[in-house]
Amino acid sequence: MRRPWTLLAIAVAMALLLPTLARATGYAIYEQGAAALGMAGASTASVKDASAVFFNPAALARLEGTRFYVGGSALAPITSVTGVGTADGARPEYGVTEEMVKQVFFPPTIYATHRLMKGLGFGIGVNSPYGLGVEWDADEFSGRYIATKVDLQTLNGSACLAWAPNDQWSFAGGADAMFAKVLLNKRTLYSNPMLGISDLDIIETEMTSDFVPGYGWNAAVLYTPAAQWRLGAFYRSKVVVHVDDAEADFTQILTGITAVDAYVTSILPPDQPGSTVLRFPALWSAGVAFDPEPDWTVEADFLWYEWSVFTDLPINLETTPALSSTRVEDYEDSWQVRVGAEHRRGDLAYRVGYYFDKSPAPGYAVSPLLPDADRIGVSLGVGWAFGPEKNWTLDAYGLGLFLNRRCGFTEDP
């Protein structure tokens, strides 16, 4: 039996972001397959490798043999905040720009599919569909009382079964188990104008958790009305993760001022258990693919994220509940449009794509904790089929992100 493999589907997604108060819309990661992302992710109707586990599980019923996919993306967000306030005490001051610490993230993608019999396919996958990495200079950043570091990691396991009753229709359903962990870090500042003291760092607060599971489901359909046309759609349900085993640690930062240090010692909360709730939105996608020539495919997709599930971020403390807090986010449902094209020539496939991603964050929710803005993405990709039976494929893509500047306002604590 011929066994197609997709090995090392290298997704080199260097995010070339304009310096703005932004990262990505929400905290979704759609970079889940190199071939698809070469077309800017427009693949709901045309995906034809094992990444169909993510992009459209209904396609599994039409994949022959056994297929494996191993890959990932290198994501390098660049974010800055520029002060626009003119009131006394505005942070940062008007015209002052502060840069986020540069980081690179490598979310993995692993898929395996198998055709059980004609018209029946099965697939499993592990990926990271959501994540957030924000870090600011803990000693100098003017917004350090909001956040100095945020690290949200997810690992999602999917299992899907697809059925094709005929050559035109195929359907799929599956289950998702998402494991999420979070780290939140910030500083507490102290000011006393009567003593001439301003913005002294006195307490560092850190909340961390282990991986905690949440569960969801998915469904998909693929329709081929004619040889040149394909219509596809999928749905992934929301996942809510209740983090009940977090640990909140409070560390005093000595100022060298005896009276201040004694005061902080007297009010310093003890290390204690904490909890929060992490909400991941449902996702709808619908796409249409057309082959104008045997060696060409073009596709357009429309995606809808139900970000309105992300209403707030509660921080609950067990020992000192009076210090618990809830950060209001009130995200709105948002949409994306993705278009792409692929040209196949011999053993090579050349890809290009474009997308627009509408930010779900209202202006008052834009902050150093969750910077966000509308974004435009442009991608280029290439695939190479090799091996004795051309059953190995190496795919790579590059993705440039260009974000609108976004103005947000956050009150001092």
What are these regions (language model features)?
Residues 61-62:
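N-terminal plug
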Residues 42-44, 67-77:
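Short strand-turn segments of transmembrane beta-barrel domains in outer membranes
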